[in-house]
Amino acid sequence: QSPGCCWNPACVKNRC
């Protein structure tokens, strides 16, 4: 369970 996708540049919702 991650709070967002800060570590994933390919994530559509790249937010922490």
Curated annotation (Swiss-Prot):
Asked if the keyword Metal-binding belongs to this entry, the reply reads no
Residues modified as Pyrrolidone carboxylic acid: 1
Q: Which domain of life is it from?
A: Eukaryota
- What is the residue range of the signal peptide feature? none
Q: In which tissues is it expressed?
A: Expressed by the venom duct.
Q: Which residues carry this modification: 4-hydroxyproline?
A: 3
Q: Which residues carry this modification: Cysteine amide?
A: 16
> Which cellular compartments is it found in?
Secreted
GO molecular function ontology, one term from the record:
acetylcholine receptor inhibitor activity
Give the CC-aspect GO terms.
extracellular region; host cell postsynaptic membrane
Principal place of residence: secreted
Q: Which family does it belong to?
A: Belongs to the conotoxin A superfamily.
What role does this protein play? Alpha-conotoxins act on postsynaptic membranes, they bind to the nicotinic acetylcholine receptors (nAChR) and thus inhibit them. This toxin causes paralysis upon intramuscular injection into goldfish and blocks both fetal (alpha-1/beta-1/delta-gamma subunits) and adult (alpha-1/beta-1/delta-epsilon subunits) subtypes of vertebrate muscle nAChRs in a dose-dependent manner.
Q: What is this protein called?
A: Alpha-conotoxin PIB
